[in-house]
UniProtKB/Swiss-Prot annotation:
The chain crosses the membrane at residues 348-366. It comes from the Eukaryota. One of its GO terms (molecular function) is carbohydrate binding. PANTHER family: INTEGRAL MEMBRANE PROTEIN DGCR2/IDD (PTHR15256), INTEGRAL MEMBRANE PROTEIN DGCR2_IDD (PTHR15256:SF6). One of its GO terms (biological process) is cell adhesion. Residues 28-68 form the LDL-receptor class A domain. Residues 25-347 are extracellular. Residues 268-331 form the VWFC domain. Residues 415-548 are annotated as: Disordered. One of its GO terms (cellular component) is membrane. This is Integral membrane protein DGCR2/IDD. It comes from Mus musculus. Pfam families: Ldl_recept_a, Lectin_C. The gene is Dgcr2. Keywords: Cell adhesion, Disulfide bond, Glycoprotein, Lectin, Membrane, Phosphoprotein, Receptor, Signal, Transmembrane, Transmembrane helix.
Length: 548
């Protein structure tokens, strides 16, 4: 039974197929003017790199099914003069490769001239037009300050190259119209003034390479008869049709006139930041490959090494940054950027939550450690009070200041019990029975219980034996006066009444903490000290039970 289109089974089957099926590789989309490699990490290369004799794609698909033309010349790292094979007036683009790291290409678009200069591959020279009006000699000094001179020409191709260039620059124009006149490096010397002016062209500055000389010039309308040397002006046209047909003329003008001028200098190494590089230094040539590193040799980049960058992940259309190596700009539609922003937001939220949880855990650990420390101190204080039994005094213990060494000092919460007032053992682990520490027994144990309640036992001072004697073992027989007549009359305190129970006597004895001494017989006025008790003998000594 085939499930219906709107059934849940069909939907689950469709989702299962989408999950199991391997996603197809997105179609490569290269910009116009680029060749799409069939495979590998390199997907798009410039179209002129196809069939140039050197494979660029990893699968060498750019060199497949290519006719052999011989126009592309691969060169190795060996001693190769990069100027070999150059023909003046020919194709200015050449491809050179170096067997170091990745293949490298050289062409006329690589910066060999500073900004504002036009490079001509035929003579390896750079040209620039200065539109500021100066006389001939000032113009020559300006060209010398930029390591050049007023332009001269060695071939017709070089002259055509200069005439075909667009010299419009953001500078103040001097007398700019559809035609222009430029000071160049020639001078016309007058040799005779018979029927007409006769003379010849000469190079204004000695030391210039072999050049061709212009044809007969057009003289200025106003000429001084005293002038024997005139300076050359090249007249060219700004209109594109006339310029492309190489229309020009030569004029002999007074050297004091002000005009624009054309400077010429040898090509030089220029880095990607438009800085001139000296001979023998490493630099990144000016161009569209910021990952190229070369050595400057005779104004050209040689011994170059290029870095191969990995294509950006998650981006189908991208463009290289012309100023920074291995930096790309994604050209995908805005949809991917929306997902990227959402992913960035989710990462930010997850980071905030993780940071909050970690901080909370740290705070809880600090609080728990402080709580355990407080509980430990409280347990130490409670154990101290329990061991010393400050609420009730124990019989037989000495509570004087020397009883415990330094006495009892209050234990504060700041005292952790280590090296402070008291010395305690570490607290026991949790969930175990607490073991009380061993206590040292006193040297003099307390008297037994029977001795403490025996009325016959007395404490006496041996030094008082001369004045007192111990009481006889048996009490005298009572007389008519009863028990009170049998007791010595010099004692102030009477005995406890007969009806007092033994338990009350024990309680009174336990609560007593002072040693009672007999009063001074001299202070008693009721009975004379010389009165002898009945029965004869010495005066009996007063005795009371003393219990600590």
């Amino acid at each position: 039974m085939v499930p219906k289109a709107d059934s849940g089974a069909f939907l689950l089957l469709f989702l299962l197929v989408l999950t199991v099926t391997e996603p197809l590789r997105p179609e490569l989309r290269c910009n116009p003017g680029q060749f799409a490699c069939h495979g590998g990490t390199i997907q798009c290369i410039p179209l002129p790199w196809q069939c140039d004799g050197w494979p660029t794609c990893e699968d060498k698909s750019d060199e497949a099914d290519c006719p052999v033309t011989g126009e592309a010349r691969p060169y190795g790292k060996e001693t190769v003069d990069l100027r070999q094979g150059r023909a003046r007036g020919g194709d200015p683009t050449h491809f050179h490769t170096v067997n170091v790291a990745q293949p490298v290409r050289f062409s006329s678009f690589l910066g060999k001239c500073p900004s504002g200069w036009h490079h001509y591959e035929g003579t390896a020279s750079c040209y620039r037009v200065y539109l500021s009006g100066e006389n001939y000699w000032d113009a020559a000094q300006t060209c010398q300050r930029v390591n050049g001179s007023l332009a001269t020409f060695s071939t017709d191709q070089e002259l055509r190259f200069v005439l075909a260039q667009e010299w419009d620059q953001p500078e103040r124009s001097f007398g700019w119209k559809d035609q222009r006149k430029l000071w160049v490096g020639y001078q016309y010397v007058i040799t005779g003034r018979n029927h007409s002016l006769e003379g010849r062209w000469e190079v204004a500055f000695k030391g210039s390479p072999e050049v061709f000389l212009p044809p007969d010039p057009i003289f200025a309308s106003a000429m001084s008869e005293n002038d024997n040397v005139f300076c050359a002006q090249l007249q060219c046209f700004h209109f594109p049709t006339l310029r492309h047909h190489d229309l020009h003329s030569w004029h002999a003008e007074s050297c004091s006139e002000k005009s624009s001028f054309l400077c010429k200098r040898s090509q030089t190494c220029v880095d990607i930041k438009d800085n001139v590089v000296d001979e023998g230094f490493y630099f990144t040539p000016k161009g569209d490959d910021p990952c190229l590193s070369c050595t400057c040799h005779r104004g050209e980049p040689e011994m170059c090494v290029a870095a191969l960058c990995e294509r950006p992940q998650g981006c189908q259309q991208y463009r290289k940054d012309p100023k920074e190596c291995c930096k790309f700009m994604c050209l995908d539609p805005d949809g991917s950027s929306l997902f990227d922003s959402m992913a960035s937001g989710m990462r930010l939220v997850v980071s905030c939550i993780s940071s909050f949880l970690i901080l909370s855990l740290l705070l809880f650990m600090v609080h728990r450690l402080a709580q355990r420390r407080r509980e430990r101190i409280e347990s130490l204080i409670g154990a101290n009070l329990h061991h010393f039994n400050l609420g009730r005094r124990i019989p037989g213990f000495d509570y004087g200041p020397d009883g415990f060494g330094t006495g009892l000092t209050p234990l504060h919460l700041s005292d952790d019990g280590e090296g402070g007032t008291f010395h305690f053992h570490d607290p026991p682990p949790p969930y175990t029975a607490y073991k009380y520490p061993d206590m040292d027994q006193p040297d003099d144990p307390p008297p037994p219980y029977e001795a403490s309640i025996n009325p016959d036992s007395v404490f006496y001072d041996p030094a008082d034996d001369d004045a007192f004697e111990p009481v006889e073992a048996s009490l005298p027989a009572p007389r008519d006066g009863g028990i009170e007549g049998a007791l010595p009359r010099h004692l102030d305190q009477p005995l406890p009444p007969a009806e007092t129970s033994l338990a009350d006597l024990e309680d009174s004895t336990d609560s007593s903490s002072a040693l009672l001494v007999p009063p001074d017989p001299a202070q008693s006025g009721s009975t004379p000290a010389t009165e002898a008790p009945p029965g004869g003998g010495r005066l009996p000594r007063a005795s009371l039970n003393t219990v600590v």
